[in-house]
């Protein structure tokens, strides 16, 4: 019988970013209580030797599973030291992988109070609205003009420590294009 391969999307992430994200998740689960119902699985609880941890986030009758890996093949860069993250949405026997932005939106919808477009309608009807969004990572678009005007009236409260964002965990902070200084540009780039 042949080997059967399963391909998964795994974002390469440096280990310090993974450690920070894990500590933010644990803080939100055990200290602040914002992440009620979340489940953290340690590496020694998993039968797979490459799994560093799993965070199970219930979303109604489905759940989001964020798995961190270690001991993977290194990437093209020196700092890609075999650490990675995969994000999976599961409902009963069906599962699919999702990107970090969608994961943040799903978490945002289920767990955090938000001052969103619906707040405008609620305020006009006389209902009490939440004055600010607690989880800014869940927004990936610019709001309507009404929303921006109402949001500008309310000064956002800084949350310490920040909420654990999957997008922030998987962003590529190393390969961002560098800006050149001055009008002459970089000496190495223009051949001088």
From Swiss-Prot:
UniProt region (Interaction with host APOBEC3F and APOBEC3G), positions on chain: 54-72
Interaction with host APOBEC3F, as annotated region: 14-17, 74-79
Compartment list: Host cytoplasm; Host cell membrane; Virion
Membrane association as annotated region, ranges: 171-172
Residues annotated with Phosphoserine modification: 144, 165
Basic residues: compositionally biased ranges: 176-186
Pfam family of the protein (one): Vif
Record-annotated site: Cleavage in virion (by viral protease): 150-151
Induction (UniProt): Expressed late during infection in a Rev-dependent manner.
Main location: host cell
This protein's UniProt keywords: AIDS, Host cell membrane, Host cytoplasm, Host membrane, Host-virus interaction, Membrane, Metal-binding, Phosphoprotein, RNA-binding, Ubl conjugation, Ubl conjugation pathway, Virion, Zinc
Record PTM: Processed in virion by the viral protease. Highly phosphorylated on serine and threonine residues.
Chain positions covered by the region annotation RNA-binding: 75-114
Region (Interaction with host APOBEC3G): 40-44
Residue ranges, annotated region (SOCS box-like): 151-180
Motif (BC-box-like motif): 144-153
An annotated GO BP: viral life cycle
Subunit structure as annotated in this protein's UniProt entry: Homomultimer; in vitro and presumably in vivo. Interacts with viral RNA and Pr55Gag precursor; these interactions mediate Vif incorporation into the virion. Interacts with the viral reverse transcriptase. Forms cullin-5-RING E3 ubiquitin-protein ligase complex (ECS complex) by interacting with host CUL5, RBX2, elongin BC complex (ELOB and ELOC) and CBFB/CBF-beta. Within the ECS complex, Vif interacts directly with host CUL5, ELOC and APOBEC (APOBEC3F and APOBEC3G) substrates.
Purpose of the protein: Counteracts the innate antiviral activity of host APOBEC3F and APOBEC3G by promoting their ubiquitination and degradation. Acts as a substrate recognition component of an E3 ubiquitin-protein ligase complex: mechanistically, Vif hijacks a host cullin-5-RING E3 ubiquitin-protein ligase complex (ECS complex) and the transcription coactivator CBFB/CBF-beta to form an active E3 ubiquitin-protein ligase complex that targets APOBEC3G and APOBEC3F for polyubiquitination, leading to their degradation by the proteasome.
Stated name of the protein: Virion infectivity factor
Species this chain originates from: Human immunodeficiency virus type 1 group M subtype B (isolate BH5) (HIV-1)
